[in-house]
C-alpha cells in the first residue's frame, strides 16, 4: 500500500477515534467508490456527497495520488492535480455551508525535486483544459523514470500553488484550505524495497530520525492533516505544512518563506 492510501486510512482511523463521522472515497473499497482520474468518477463523488450531506461538510481531505514511478504520465496529472482540484471545487458549496476546511496532500519534493516548471505553469494557468494537457504529456516517454518524477513533482507543485492562490478567496467565505507536504513515509511498498533502494531512500536525511534508519510514519502525517482540518487550526489558512522530520529545513535552511 502506497503513502497516499495508508495516510488516508490513518486519517480516517484518527477521526473515528474522536467520534467523527467519516466518508471514505476510494476507487475500490470506499464508502463512495469512484475513479478520481476521470471526470465521470469525480462527478459521481460530488453528486454522492451532496446526496449524503446536503446540509454541508465540516472537512474535506484529499490524499489520492500516484508516484512518478507508476509509468503512466497521464494518470500522474489526472489524479494528482485535476482529480484533487475538481473534488475541492465540486464540494466547495458543502464546505461553505458549515464553515468547513480542506486539506490537500502534496509532497516535500516540491522544494527539492527536479520538476518541469513549464508544466506546473500550464497546469495552474490552464486547468480548465485537462484533455489538451494530458495529450501533451502523452508524447513523453512514460518508461523514463526521470520524466515520471519530474511530472510528479510538477503535479504536486501546481497543486500547492493552486491551494495558495485560492486560500484567500475561500477563507473570505468561511472555508479554510491548506496543504501537507510529507517526506518519505514507511509503507508496505517501502518494506519490500531492495537493500539498494532502501539505502538510496535513507540517503535523504530526516533530522528527527537521525541514527534510526527509518522513515516518517503514516500516523505522523495523519496527525498533521487532522490538526489542519480541526477547529484548533482556525487561524491557519493557505499554508504548505512540511511534515518531513525537518528535511526541507535542512536542505533549504536559508529560505524562510
Regions found by a protein language model. Give the residues of each.
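A conserved structural motif in NAD(P)-dependent oxidoreductases
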Residues: 207-221, 232
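Short, flexible catalytic-loop segment of classical short-chain dehydrogenase/reductase
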Residues: 181-192, 196
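Short, small/polar-rich loop/turn modules that mediate ligand/substrate recognition or access, typified
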Residues: 176, 236-238
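Alpha-helical segment proximal to the catalytic Tyr-Lys
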Residues: 93, 168-169, 234
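Canonical Rossmann dinucleotide-binding motif of NAD(H)/NADP(H)-dependent dehydrogenases/reductases
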Residues: 1-23
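Rossmann-fold cofactor-recognition segment
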Residues: 25-41, 49, 62-65
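Catalytic loop of short-chain dehydrogenase/reductase
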Residues: 65-70, 98-172, 184-187
